[in-house]
C-alpha cells in the first residue's frame, strides 16, 4: 500500500490565519495527506502569510529562500504560498518572479479551491497563481483539522470595514461578512460533542457582528445564545474595536457564566491627535470612559490591548499621552509594536515619518511601563484560588501542567495528567512577569 504523502504548514500572523491553516489541513486530511512537523520530510509545504507588519513579510522571504535547496533535492516537492501577503497588489507576480520554484500562489478569498489547485499541480506538473480580487459568500462546512483537542477557534465574521489609516487588513480580507448564528451554534455544538471545552470566537471586530445579516442579530445576542450550549465550559472572543463595544455587550459578558472576563481592547495610541490621524473614531477620553464602564460592569475583568509606537507625526507629547493612558488603565498585558509602513494604506504617504532610533527609544520606555504593570497585576493573584482549564503539560517544564484562568492568565502547576481538559481550582503561590505558579487545591 502506498505511503500517505506528508504536508507541513507554517503560519504567520493572527488567529484568523491559524484557523485558515486548520481548514487547509482539514482539506489535506480528506485528500489522504498526513501532517508532519519536519519540513525536510514533507511532500507539500504551505506558507500561510501575514502582511500586517513588514517583519512578517521578511520572515516569509527568508523562509522561501531556504526552500530552493530542498526543491532541488526533491523536485516533486510542492510549495504553496497563501494568505494575506499574497492578496496585496502585484505580490503574487513578485513571488513567482523572485521564487519561480513556488507551485501554488493563492489569496484569502479562495481557500476552499485549494484541493483543485493541488490536484492540477500534481497531475499536470504546472503552477497555479490564483488571486481573487473580491470576497465571495461565506463557505460553510469546510473540513477542519484542529490544532488542539479541547479548545478551538470559531470564526463568527470575516473582513473589516474600519479602514484605520495604518492597516492593510480591509484591503486583503475584504468587507465585513457575518456568519449566520445557527451555523456558528451548530459548529460549536459539534465541537462540544467531540469533547471541546473552550471556544474562542474570532473576528477582526467581533462587536460589528450581525450588521451584514438580514435578521435582528448582534454580538451581545450571539453571546447570550451561545451561553446556553450544554457541555461548553468557556467562551472567549477577540478582537473588539472600542468604538463598537456597547453597553449590551458589557452586560452580556457580566451575565453569561460561560463568557470569560477578559476583553482585548486595542487602543493603539493614548493621544487623541494620533487617534484622529489613525481614523480610530474615538478619543482618549472616549476610550477611558469605556474602560471605566467595563471595569464597573464586569467583576474582576482583565483588559489587554495593542499599542503602536512611532506613528507618523507622533510627537513626544503624543507618546507621553500613550504612556500616561497605559498607567491609568493598568492593562493586564499589552502587545506593543513599532509602526510599520504598509504600502497602499493612507499612513504610508503621511509626512513626518518617525526615525527608527526615536521609535525604538519610545518603544523600550513603553515596554518597561507595560511589563511593570503586568507584574503588578499578576501579583494581585498571589494567595487567591482561581478556576483553571487544564490545557496540557507546561511548555517550559514537562513535569508540570499548564492552564489558563478565566481572565487569560497562564498558570503552571504540579498536578495529575488526568486533570487535562477539566476545570480545577488552583491556589496561586507565586506571580511572575508573564505567568503564574500555583498548586491544585
UniProtKB/Swiss-Prot annotation:
Residues 379-441 form the TRAM domain. InterPro entries: Elp3/MiaA/NifB-like_rSAM (IPR006638), Methylthiotransferase (IPR005839), Methylthiotransferase_CS (IPR020612), Methylthiotransferase_N (IPR013848), Methylthiotransferase_N_sf (IPR038135), MiaB_methiolase (IPR006463), rSAM (IPR007197), rSAM_horseshoe (IPR023404). It is an enzyme of class 2 (transferase). [4Fe-4S] cluster 2 binds at residues 160, 164, 167. Binds 2 [4Fe-4S] clusters. One cluster is coordinated with 3 cysteines and an exchangeable S-adenosyl-L-methionine. [4Fe-4S] cluster 1 binds at residues 14, 50, 84. CDD domains: Radical_SAM. Belongs to the methylthiotransferase family. MiaB subfamily. Catalyzes the methylthiolation of N6-(dimethylallyl)adenosine (i(6)A), leading to the formation of 2-methylthio-N6-(dimethylallyl)adenosine (ms(2)i(6)A) at position 37 in tRNAs that read codons beginning with uridine. This is tRNA-2-methylthio-N(6)-dimethylallyladenosine synthase. The lineage of its organism: Bacteria, Bacillati, Bacillota, Clostridia, Eubacteriales. The gene is miaB.
Amino acid at each position: 500500500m502506498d505511503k500517505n504523502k506528508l504536508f507541513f504548514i507554517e503560519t504567520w500572523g493572527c488567529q484568523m490565519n491559524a484557523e485558515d491553516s486548520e481548514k487547509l489541513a482539514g482539506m489535506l486530511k480528506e485528500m489522504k495527506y498526513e501532517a508532519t512537523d519536519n519540513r525536510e520530510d514533507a511532500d507539500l509545504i504551505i506558507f500561510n502569510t501575514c502582511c500586517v507588519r513588514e517583519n512578517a513579510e521578511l520572515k516569509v522571504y527568508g523562509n522561501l529562500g531556504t526552500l530552493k535547496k530542498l526543491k532541488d533535492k526533491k523536485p516533486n516537492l510542492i510549495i504553496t504560498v497563501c494568505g494575506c501577503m499574497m492578496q496585496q497588489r502585484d505580490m503574487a507576480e513578485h513571488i513567482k518572479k523572485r521564487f519561480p520554484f513556488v507551485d501554488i500562489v493563492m489569496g484569502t478569498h479562495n481557500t476552499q479551491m485549494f484541493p483543485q489547485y493541488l490536484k492540477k499541480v500534481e497531475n499536470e506538473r504546472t503552477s497555479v497563481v490564483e488571486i481573487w480580487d473580491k470576497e465571495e459568500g461565506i463557505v460553510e462546512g469546510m473540513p477542519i483539522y484542529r490544532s488542539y483537542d479541547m479548545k478551538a477557534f470559531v470564526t463568527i465574521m470575516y473582513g473589516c470595514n474600519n479602514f484605520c489609516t495604518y492597516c492593510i487588513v480591509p484591503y486583503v480580507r475584504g468587507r465585513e461578512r457575518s456568519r449566520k448564528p445557527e451555523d456558528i451554534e451548530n459548529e460549536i455544538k459539534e465541537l462540544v460533542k467531540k469533547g471541546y471545552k473552550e471556544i474562542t470566537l474570532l473576528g477582526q471586530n467581533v462587536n460589528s457582528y450581525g450588521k451584514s445579516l438580514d435578521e435582528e442579530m448582534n454580538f451581545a445576542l450571539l453571546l447570550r445564545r451561545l451561553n446556553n450550549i450544554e457541555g461548553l465550559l468557556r467562551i472567549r472572543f477577540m478582537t473588539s474595536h472600542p468604538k463598537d463595544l456597547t453597553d449590551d455587550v458589557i452586560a452580556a459578558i457580566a451575565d453569561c457564566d460561560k463568557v470569560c472576563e477578559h476583553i482585548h481592547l486595542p487602543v493603539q495610541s493614548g493621544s487623541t491627535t494620533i487617534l484622529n490621524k489613525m481614523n480610530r473614531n474615538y478619543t482618549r477620553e472616549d476610550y477611558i470612559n469605556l474602560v471605566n464602564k467595563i471595569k464597573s460592569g464586569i467583576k474582576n475583568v482583565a483588559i489587554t490591548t495593542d499599542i503602536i509606537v512611532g506613528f507618523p507625526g507622533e510627537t513626544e507629547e503624543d507618546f507621553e499621552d500613550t504612556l500616561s493612558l497605559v498607567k491609568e488603565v493598568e492593562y493586564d498585558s499589552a502587545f506593543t509594536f513599532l509602526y510599520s509602513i504598509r504600502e497602499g494604506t493612507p499612513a504610508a504617504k503621511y509626512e513626518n515619518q518617525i526615525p527608527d532610533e526615536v521609535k525604538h527609544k519610545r518603544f523600550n520606555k513603553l515596554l518597561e511601563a507595560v511589563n511593570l504593570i503586568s507584574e503588578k497585576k499578576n501579583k494581585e493573584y498571589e494567595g487567591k484560588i482561581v478556576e483553571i482549564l487544564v490545557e496540557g503539560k507546561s511548555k517550559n517544564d514537562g513535569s508540570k501542567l499548564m492552564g489558563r484562568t478565566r481572565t487569560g492568565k497562564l498558570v503552571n502547576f504540579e498536578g495529575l495528567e488526568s486533570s487535562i481538559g477539566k476545570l480545577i481550582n488552583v491556589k496561586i503561590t507565586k506571580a511572575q512577569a508573564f505567568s503564574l505558579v500555583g498548586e491544585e487545591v
